[in-house]
C-alpha cells in the first residue's frame, strides 16, 4: 500500500511517498519517491501529524509523451476523420489511439486496456470515459480500423515523411511471420508454413514491412496468408506497393533492397515493369560461377562501420554483366567475420551428424548379429544410403569405411578434407546484384548491410517480455482475419513511434536506447493526495531528473 512519510535530510524535512509490500510475512518498504520540501505542503495539514484520506498515483511521463508525439503526427485526427464518415462513434479515434499507445507503454490483452488506462494520468485528462474501453467496444474499433487501414496508412505515412524529412527513394522490403495459438482453420490468413522460430506445428500469419534506408522508420505493411513464400507474395504485392508509393507522390522510380528469397527472371521483370530498381542477392544454385571466384581474386576492400560492434572488413570484386535479360552490377563479397561464425556452426552440426551416424551403425550391427542372413542390412551400399538420408548436405563431408565380415560390422568415420575445404570455401561469400548501374560498389555494399534496420524492426515486434518490455506483437490470440490484420497494424503504428523516438535521439546525439528512454519516462509519476476538508486532492509530479529533461527535449515534448 502507498503512504506518506517525512524524512529529515541536512536539517530539512521533506515529504516522501512510500510503498510497502509483505516480504516473508514482514511489511517492508520497497519504493520511495521524493515529493518536495515539507513546508510546501504546510497549508494542507493542520500540523505535522498528517491526516490523509487516500493517495493515488498514476503513470504520467510515458503516456503523456507518447500522446504528444502521436498528436504531432495527427494520429487521432486521421483515425477519427477517416472512420467517422461511416460511424457516429465520437470516441473511435481516441480508442484506436489508446490501443496503439498501449502497445508501446504496457502491452496487454485488449480486455485489459481499461485496467491499464485507469493506472495512467490519461484517466484524469483524456476526454473519454473509461467504459469506452470495454472489450466489445475495443473489438468493434478494431474492425473499423481494418476497414479503413489503407487510407489511414497513406495519410500517416505522408505526415511522417514531411515532419521527419524522410525520403523513400531507397526502401528495404522484408517479410516475417507470427505464430498463434488460435485454431481457426477457416481463416484465410492463419495457415501452417515454415515458421522462423521453429513452431511449424502452429498456425501463423505472414507480415511484410517496408522502411526507409536511412532511419529505419517503417511505412507500409501487409498481413497475408501464413503458407505463402516470398516469391508467391512478391507477385501479388508489387503492383500494390507501387500504388501506395504513387499515392505519396513517388511517381518516378524507387529502389527496393530485398532478400535472396526473391529470385528468378520473372520476379525482377515484374519489379521493373512497376518502376522499381533493386538490390538483391543471387543464389549459388542458379549462378555458381560467381561463388566459385577464389578469395584471392577479391582484391578490393571496404570497411563497414557498426554502432555497437567492431567494424567489418569486406573483400569484394565487381563486374557489369548481363543476367535476367538486363545488364547488372554484380559483386562477389567475402566477410571474414561471417566465415568464422559459419565454420564454428558447421563444426557443431558435423559433430551432431557424426553421432547420429554412429548410433545408426550400432543399430545395424545389433540387427546383423541377431538376424545374420535374415538382416535387411547385409548390404553396405544400403547402409550408406541410410546414413545419407540423415543429412544429405553433410554426408559428402565425411568418409565412411564400413566392413561386414562374418556378421560382424565394423566402421570408421573421418573427415573428407577435400570436400570439407570445398564446402567451407563459400562461407562468408555473398553475391549481390543491382539494376542501379549508377551506384558505386561500396554504396551497394553499405545498402546491403544496412538491411539490419528492417531486421531490427522485426526483432522489436517479435521480442518477448525478457528481451523487450515494450512493443510486443505476440502472443497473438485473435482468430478473426479482420482482427488479426488490425492487431498487426496497431503494432506497426506503435513501431513507427518507437523508431521516430530512436531517430530523434540520434539526431540529438543522446546515447540511450529507446527502451531505456521509455523506462525513464515511465518513472515520472503524478500523485493525487486527498486531505480531509479539501475538495480537490493535492496534485504533484515527482521532480524530473536531468536525464529526463534531456529526453523530453530530444523528443520535442513538454510535461
Q: What residue spans do the PLM features occupy?
A:
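Dynamic "connector" segments at or just before major functional cores
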Residues: 1-191, 210-229, 235, 243, ...
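Short, conserved catalytic/metal-binding motifs centered on acidic residues
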Residues: 17, 113, 169-178, 216, ...
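Secondary-structure transition/capping motifs at alpha-helix termini
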Residues: 23-24, 120-124, 149, 164, ...
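Short glycine-rich loop/turn motifs
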Residues: 203-208, 427-431, 458
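An anionic, glycine-rich sequence signature occurring as long contiguous blocks
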Residues: 220-223, 274, 279-447, 514, ...
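Catalytic or ion-translocation cores adjacent to nucleophile or general acid/base/metal-coordination motifs
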Residues: 223, 227-239, 244-253, 262, ...
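Short amphipathic alpha-helical "interface-anchor" segments enriched in bulky aromatics
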Residues: 441-477
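Conserved nucleotidyltransferase catalytic core and NTase-mimicking acidic/glycine-rich helix/loop elements
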Residues: 500-528
Amino acid at each position: 500500500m502507498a503512504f506518506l512519510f517525512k524524512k529529515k535530510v541536512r536539517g530539512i524535512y521533506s515529504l516522501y511517498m512510500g510503498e510497502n509490500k509483505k516480504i516473508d510475512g514482514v511489511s517492508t518498504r520497497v519504493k520511495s519517491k521524493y515529493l518536495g520540501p515539507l513546508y510546501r505542503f504546510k497549508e494542507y495539514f493542520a500540523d505535522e501529524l498528517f491526516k490523509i484520506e487516500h493517495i493515488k498515483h498514476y503513470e504520467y511521463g510515458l503516456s503523456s509523451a507518447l500522446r504528444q508525439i502521436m498528436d504531432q503526427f495527427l494520429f487521432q485526427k486521421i483515425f477519427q476523420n477517416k472512420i467517422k464518415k461511416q460511424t457516429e462513434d465520437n470516441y473511435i479515434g481516441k480508442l484506436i489511439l489508446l490501443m496503439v499507445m498501449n502497445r508501446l507503454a504496457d502491452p496487454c490483452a485488449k480486455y485489459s486496456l481499461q485496467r491499464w488506462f485507469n493506472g495512467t494520468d490519461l484517466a484524469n485528462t483524456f476526454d473519454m470515459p473509461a467504459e469506452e474501453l470495454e472489450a466489445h467496444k475495443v473489438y468493434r474499433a478494431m474492425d473499423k480500423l481494418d476497414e479503413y487501414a489503407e487510407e489511414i496508412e497513406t495519410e500517416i505515412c505522408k505526415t511522417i515523411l514531411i515532419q521527419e524529412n524522410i525520403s523513400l527513394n531507397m526502401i528495404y522490403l522484408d517479410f516475417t511471420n507470427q505464430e498463434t495459438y488460435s485454431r481457426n482453420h477457416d481463416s484465410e490468413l492463419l495457415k501452417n508454413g515454415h515458421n522462423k522460430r521453429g513452431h511449424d506445428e502452429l498456425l501463423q500469419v505472414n507480415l511484410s514491412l517496408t522502411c526507409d534506408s536511412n532511419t529505419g522508420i517503417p511505412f507500409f505493411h501487409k498481413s497475408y496468408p501464413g503458407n505463402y513464400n516470398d516469391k508467391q507474395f512478391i507477385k501479388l504485392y508489387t503492383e500494390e506497393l507501387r500504388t501506395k508509393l504513387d499515392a505519396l507522390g513517388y511517381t518516378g522510380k524507387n529502389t527496393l533492397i530485398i532478400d535472396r528469397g526473391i529470385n528468378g527472371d520473372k520476379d525482377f521483370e515484374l519489379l521493373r515493369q512497376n518502376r522499381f530498381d533493386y538490390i538483391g542477392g543471387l543464389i549459388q544454385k542458379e549462378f555458381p560461377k560467381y561463388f566459385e571466384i577464389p578469395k584471392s581474386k577479391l582484391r578490393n576492400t571496404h570497411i563497414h562501420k557498426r554502432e555497437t560492434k567492431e567494424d567489418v572488413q569486406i573483400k569484394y570484386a565487381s563486374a557489369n554483366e548481363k543476367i535476367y535479360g538486363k545488364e547488372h552490377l554484380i559483386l562477389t563479397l567475402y566477410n571474414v567475420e561471417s566465415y568464422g561464425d559459419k565454420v564454428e556452426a558447421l563444426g557443431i552440426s558435423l559433430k551432431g551428424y557424426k553421432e547420429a551416424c554412429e548410433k545408426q551403425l550400432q543399430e545395424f550391427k545389433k540387427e546383423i548379429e541377431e538376424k545374420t542372413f535374415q538382416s535387411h542390412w547385409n548390404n553396405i551400399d544400403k547402409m550408406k544410403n541410410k546414413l545419407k538420408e540423415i543429412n544429405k548436405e553433410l554426408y559428402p563431408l565425411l568418409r565412411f569405411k564400413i566392413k561386414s565380415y562374418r556378421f560382424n560390422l565394423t566402421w570408421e568415420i573421418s573427415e573428407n578434407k577435400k570436400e570439407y575445404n570445398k564446402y567451407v570455401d563459400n562461407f562468408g561469400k555473398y553475391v549481390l546484384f543491382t539494376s542501379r548501374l549508377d551506384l558505386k560498389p561500396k554504396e551497394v555494399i553499405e545498402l546491403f548491410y544496412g538491411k539490419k534496420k528492417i531486421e531490427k524492426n522485426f526483432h522489436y515486434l517479435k521480442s518477448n517480455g525478457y528481451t523487450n518490455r515494450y512493443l510486443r506483437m505476440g502472443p497473438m490470440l485473435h482468430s478473426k482475419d479482420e482482427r488479426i490484420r488490425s492487431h498487426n497494424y496497431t503494432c506497426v503504428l506503435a513501431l513507427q513511434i518507437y523508431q521516430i523516438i530512436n531517430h530523434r535521439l540520434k539526431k540529438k546525439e543522446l546515447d540511450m536506447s529507446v527502451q531505456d528512454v521509455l523506462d525513464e519516462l515511465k518513472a515520472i509519476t503524478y500523485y493525487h493526495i486527498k486531505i480531509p476538508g479539501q475538495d480537490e486532492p493535492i496534485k504533484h509530479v515527482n521532480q524530473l531528473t536531468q536525464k529526463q529533461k534531456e529526453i523530453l527535449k530530444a523528443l520535442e515534448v513538454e510535461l
